[in-house]
Amino acid sequence: MSVAKYPDIFDELKSEVRAAGLLDRIPVRGSIEMIAIIISMILVYVVVFNWENIAPPAFGAVALGLFMTIIFTRAVFVSHDVLHTQYFKNKSLSFKLSYPFAAIIISNSSSWWDFKHNINHHTWCNVPEKDEDILAMDGAFAPKYKGNKAWLRSYKYLIFWGAMFFMYPAFIIQSYNFAIKRKKYGELALMLMHWPIVWGPVFYFLPFSDAITVYLVLNFVLSPWLAFGFITNHLGCEVFEKDESEDLTWMELQMRTSRSLSGGAFIHWFYGGLNTQIEHHLFPKAPRFNLLKIKKMTQDFAKKHNMKYFETTPLEAYVQINDVIKKY
C-alpha cells in the first residue's frame, strides 16, 4: 500500500522560488562571511599574542572561549553551506573553500560530511537503511529499529541529553575515522593542522590555567549549541522504510521527515539557518540567507494545496523529542 499523501507538484513551487531569484548563488555575500570568520580568527591571535599586555580580567579566558565558540559555529555553518554549493556552483571549488573552515578551524572532514550529510541524509532523510542520524539513541526515533537495552532505559535521559555536550568531539572522531578508512590523507593532514594552528598559540602564550579554560569553555558551549540545533531538524518526525520512501515524491519525503522552527532573524542566525529545515531540504542549494523568504512561500504553497507543514517553536521541538525518548 502506498504511503503517499501529497500531490506531485514540487516543480510548481520550485518555479516560484526560482522566479523570485531565491535559488541564485551568492558568491559575494558568502565570501564576505568567510572573510569575516578569517578576520575574527586573526583577532583571536592578536589577543592571544598580547595576552600579558592586555592584562585581561579574571573572566578574560571565558570571554575568549565564548568568542572562539561563535567563530567555530559560524565555521560549521559556512562549511555546511559551501559544501551544498550555496555560494559557488563549482563543486570542486566549494570543496577547496570548505577546508579552512571545516578542516583547519574545526578539524572536521569535508569528505565525511559530504558523504554522511549531503549524499545519504539529504537523499534518504529519515530512512534508517541509509540515514544513520535517525538511529540515534539505539533507534528510539525509528520504531522498527528500536532496541531494548535495560541499562539504556535506566539512564536514557541522562545519556541522550548529556551526549549533547560531547557532539563536537564526536564529530572529530567520526571525521578522523572516515579520513583514515577512505585514505583521505591530504585532508587528514589539514585536519591535524588544526591543533598547532588553532590551539598551539593559545597554550603557548596563555598561562596554562587560562588556556585550559578557553579550551573547555569552547568545547562545552559549542557542542550543545550545535547539538540542540541539529536534533530539532528530524528527530520526532516521520520515519520511512526504503521501499516506502521510494513511493514518495521528493517534496513529500522532505516535508514529512523535517521540522521547521518558528522565529525571526535571531533564531535564524542562532540555528545557522537550520530552523528552516523543511526549506533547506527542499532546496539544499538555496543560500541560507534566502531561506526565511522561501519559508513564507513554502507555507503559503502548503496551505493552498492542503499539505501539512510541520513547524513548532524550539521549546516544543525539544518537548516532542523528549516525549519520544520517554517511550523508549
Where do the protein language model's features map onto the residues?
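N-terminal signal-anchor/initial transmembrane insertion module
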Residues: K5-D8, E12-A20, D24-V28, E33
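Membrane-interfacial helix termini and the short, flexible loops that connect transmembrane helices
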Residues: R18, L22-R25, W51-I54, V78-K91
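Transmembrane alpha-helix/helix-exit interface in multi-pass inner-membrane proteins
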Residues: L226-D243
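Membrane-embedded catalytic scaffold of the fatty acid hydroxylase/desaturase
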Residues: F67-K183, E246-Y328
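Residue-level signal for inorganic ion chemistry
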Residues: E16, H234, H280
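Short, charged cytosolic
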Residues: M1-E16, Y157-Y168
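Juxtamembrane transmembrane-helix termini
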Residues: N53-I54, N177, G236, F240
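Alpha-helical bilayer-embedded segments of polytopic membrane proteins, i.e.
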Residues: R25-A75, A102-I106, K156-F171, R182-F230
